[in-house]
Amino acid sequence: MTDYPIKYRLIKTEKHTGARLGEIITPHGTFPTPMFMPVGTQATVKTQSPEELKAIGSGIILSNTYHLWLRPGDELIARSGGLHKFMNWDQPILTDSGGFQVYSLADSRNITEEGVTFKNHLNGSKMFLSPEKAISIQNNLGSDIMMSFDECPQFYQPYDYVKKSIERTSRWAERGLKAHRRPHDQGLFGIVQGAGFEDLRRQSAADLVAMDFPGYSIGGLAVGESHEEMNAVLDFTTPLLPENKPRYLMGVGAPDSLIDGVIRGVDMFDCVLPTRIARNGTCMTSEGRLVIKNAKFAEDFTPLDHDCDCYTCQNYSRAYIRHLLKADETFGIRLTSYHNLYFLVNLMKKVRQAIMDDNLLEFRQDFLERYGYNKSNRNF
């Protein structure tokens, strides 16, 4: 049996759904699952210190291979002692492969069997990223969990294109495994693609499971498809993945999508959503989203969320936070970002308890009713 640096321990499966309560053991510690991972694109979660992230309960954070490769450079980070030391974070780190960022540069990239040529978004220079290079960068960064280099096809691309894409992604995954220099202390995940086509998702999953990765990611979702389409893909994809290994749904952070992903057997999630909307003054609360810059909050001296015990809600009012944001004070963004991150991390804590109590479906219904979801208006 392979001795992986990343191990998944299943504690309990919820009686009425596919939801899993577990934990993931890494070289830099263990974190409970299901878990939402804050995104620290540039080796920092925007406006938050490592101490604040620990107070929030973030057991693991994500950093971005593409951005750190361009600036300050993976070799510089390696010389500093690795990403953990560079950013003063002693808990687990996951790095993506850079594939999604390259995918997002659709107008300036060229995909071949060897890899992807694209324009550096900082200075316009030509860059080349291959499966081997993506692994080399992540080996230099020293993250606990790494991603294979993949192509993320658009959800509605033609069948023939997606078929060729997943076959290439499988070949890239095999090349990445061979290039991996640190399998003893860095766990490499394979990424299942296939857009909305069930047979292609099956083919992609079968290819990757045969390669025996320590964990598996589900990619190519949250890229413009409907919530119902995402759930349908998860319904037929997660059962294809090994029960004894972690399952990671990439780029998902809306509360209803998190809960629905957990119901379908997903263990890990990440998204820039909580910090991105916080910078615009949008806050997640137990009763729905709150746009704090609105004039009606100018003299509202209550917390952002009456049911939240985070640092922001325990110490500051809506009126004060609105004032900070209207005055372009960074502290306002820090407070809203802290609250939104806490909200999602704490939501996952409540979800874990609901799995333990075998009442996740009831929890989902109660949460969504309070939050104000309906099909015509999916608030964050």
UniProtKB/Swiss-Prot annotation:
One GO location term (cellular component): cytosol
Cofactor(s) it depends on: Zn(2+)
Gene3D superfamilies (UniProt xref): Queuine tRNA-ribosyltransferase-like (3.20.20.105)
UniProt KW Transferase keyword: yes
Cofactor, how bound (note): Binds 1 zinc ion per subunit.
Binding site for substrate: 96-100, 150, 193, 220
Pathway assigned to this chain's UniProt record: tRNA modification; tRNA-queuosine biosynthesis
Gene Ontology biological-process entries: queuosine biosynthetic process; tRNA wobble guanine modification; tRNA-guanine transglycosylation
Residues bound to Zn(2+): 308, 310, 313, 339
Listed EC numbers: 2.4.2.29
MF-aspect GO terms: metal ion binding; tRNA-guanosine(34) queuine transglycosylase activity
Keyword Ribosomal protein appears in the UniProt entry: no
Superkingdom, natural source: Bacteria
Region (RNA binding): 251-257, 275-279
Reactions performed catalytically: 7-aminomethyl-7-carbaguanine + guanosine(34) in tRNA = 7-aminomethyl-7-carbaguanosine(34) in tRNA + guanine
One Pfam match: TGT
Active-site residue list: 96 (proton acceptor), 270 (nucleophile)
Family: Belongs to the queuine tRNA-ribosyltransferase family.
HAMAP family, sorted: Q_tRNA_Tgt
Quaternary structure, from the entry: Homodimer. Within each dimer, one monomer is responsible for RNA recognition and catalysis, while the other monomer binds to the replacement base PreQ1.
Protein's job: Catalyzes the base-exchange of a guanine (G) residue with the queuine precursor 7-aminomethyl-7-deazaguanine (PreQ1) at position 34 (anticodon wobble position) in tRNAs with GU(N) anticodons (tRNA-Asp, -Asn, -His and -Tyr). Catalysis occurs through a double-displacement mechanism. The nucleophile active site attacks the C1' of nucleotide 34 to detach the guanine base from the RNA, forming a covalent enzyme-RNA intermediate. The proton acceptor active site deprotonates the incoming PreQ1, allowing a nucleophilic attack on the C1' of the ribose to form the product.
NCBIfam families in alphabetical order: Q_tRNA_tgt, tgt_general
Protein known as: Queuine tRNA-ribosyltransferase
Species, as recorded: Streptococcus pyogenes serotype M5 (strain Manfredo)
Gene name of this polypeptide: tgt
